[in-house]
Amino acid sequence: MWIRDARPDEADALTALVLRSKAHWGYDAAFLATCRDELTISPEELTARRIVVAEDDTAVLGVTSLEGRPPDGVLGLLFVEPSAIGGGIGRTLYAHVLDTARELGFKRLTIDSDPHAEPFYRALGARPAPAGEGPLPRLEVTLTPRADWAQAWTGGRRAVHLGNVAEFQGQFGEVTQEARRAAGHYASLAAFASPHPAALVLPRPVPGEWTALVARQLGWGQVEVYEELTGPDVLTRPALVRHLRGLGLPFVPWGHTDASGELSGRGLPPGALRYESKRASHTLFRRLAPDHPGIAVPEQWTPATRREAARLIAARARSGTATVVKSEHGAGGSGTRVLKRRARARSLPRGPLLLEEYVAGDGTPSDPTYDGLVDGDGQVHDVGVAAMDVADTAYQGATVGPGAVPEELAAHALRFGRAVGRELAATGYRGWYDVDFVTGPGGRLAPTEINLRLTGPSAAFMAKLRLDETRGGDHLVRSLDRVPLGARLPETELIAFLRELTERCAGIDAVLIPSIPTAGYEPDPYVGVLVAARTAGRLDAAEALVRAASTDLAGLFG
């Protein structure tokens, strides 16, 4: 489905659609006759009323209008073909109106709602307006300004997303076949590389109905999907390159590579990715820490050999202290282990090896993370602080939104994360980054690594911004990147399961957004999702529902 401007030659057909939609709610012919003049669309007014339609390959499915001049406007029409009601068309059109209104500088919209439509608008954040004349419920929508970071990220526009996870990782060492396969699944998160994609370029096929399901939840318009393509693959297809560049939209890669720089025309200078190294980032942390009383940097050692590392680990184990063993590069906890006893040298990873003081997270949350970005001019923008879910050393997901991280802890992370961003900007880095922490004794934050790319928490921040803008309120969003399934599900059954889950979550006033839909038929099947709600209780209930339903598949298909 896509949205376009209405054409003069379809004014009569759109009027007929509006009247059919109105009649759907049980109004008789006599009543509709009294409404006809008000609901008639004339060819001459299409532009002035900013009338647009939603259509698929076969028919126009809905129509809406944004009327008036900034700062105060009116949502004049929003009608959906009766056979398409309940399919997310109205929500997508409503989101389009809000997007357009923000772009044009509107601050408020009023809606004279049909009584039957009032619950729809109320669920999307509209509230009763001050009493006014007229027989219809009058609602009002306050359009909050777009977040500073979102404006800096894509100029507030849609974007072309490149899921180049394995390519990015391959810049720092060999990517095994197993890791490449996992990265292919994880690359689905590139759908959330900005709040509203126009096109996705992904390294593996995704279920055909997945993007439509996500679009329905987030009010996206039509999204072009190009599968089984890496950045270098795209560059070998001149027609595709011309098309993507011809969209005139920002390119957003998962991480910067030579290929993504060539596609976007915005490459990075040599050395701009240096702080992706855990050794280099630790050096930076120690340099910055004296100006940040809330930060305590763990000790780090760089043994020359695995044998030397084993001796140091054993000595620390004898004194009752654990040691973190890190590879210099690695994502999501890969290449990182916590050892509480001695280890044989041959069991340790090859290559550059780092040993680090183990900090047992004893705060709430135990693993916060700061997300920010450096814009094209080198200015740093805070995105926020998330509470990560980390099992042992493996990243599982993150929660963003009100109350996810206590204010004092968040303030320390924001200040330090901002300082890191300024150092990144000085190296020539431009783009998204995060700083991961462990909450140590006394609530002091121990920084552990920098990621110079998009991350799991970034997907939660993008979804939160989109939900807040299109549904109102201040959402909590939780990313669950690996929810085990009780049975392997082929694509058709997986989409049916996810569709049912979205409806069940809606029934408890929560939102479910499938984020990783490609691993349902793996030997150890799983799915990734984002869940959202306006309260912590509903968010927890939604997660519990998703996990229980996923486990229960064993009884249905096992």
Where are these regions (language model features)?
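Conserved ATP-binding module of the ATP-grasp superfamily
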Residues: 295-298, 320-325, 338-364, 556
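Conserved N-proximal alpha/beta basic substrate-recognition cap immediately N-terminal to
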Residues: 179-193, 200-311
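Peripheral (often C-terminal) accessory segments that flank ATP-dependent C-N-forming ligase machineries
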Residues: 468-558
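A long amphipathic alpha-helix within ATP-dependent nucleotide-binding catalytic cores
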Residues: 395-442, 486-507
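Acetyl-CoA-dependent GNAT
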Residues: 5-77, 81-83, 94-95
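Conserved GNAT acetyl-CoA-binding A-motif
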Residues: 101-114
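Conserved acetyl-CoA-binding loop-helix of GNAT-fold acetyltransferases
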Residues: 86-99
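ATP-dependent carboxylate/phosphate-activation module, predominantly the ATP-grasp catalytic core
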Residues: 361, 369-421, 451-479
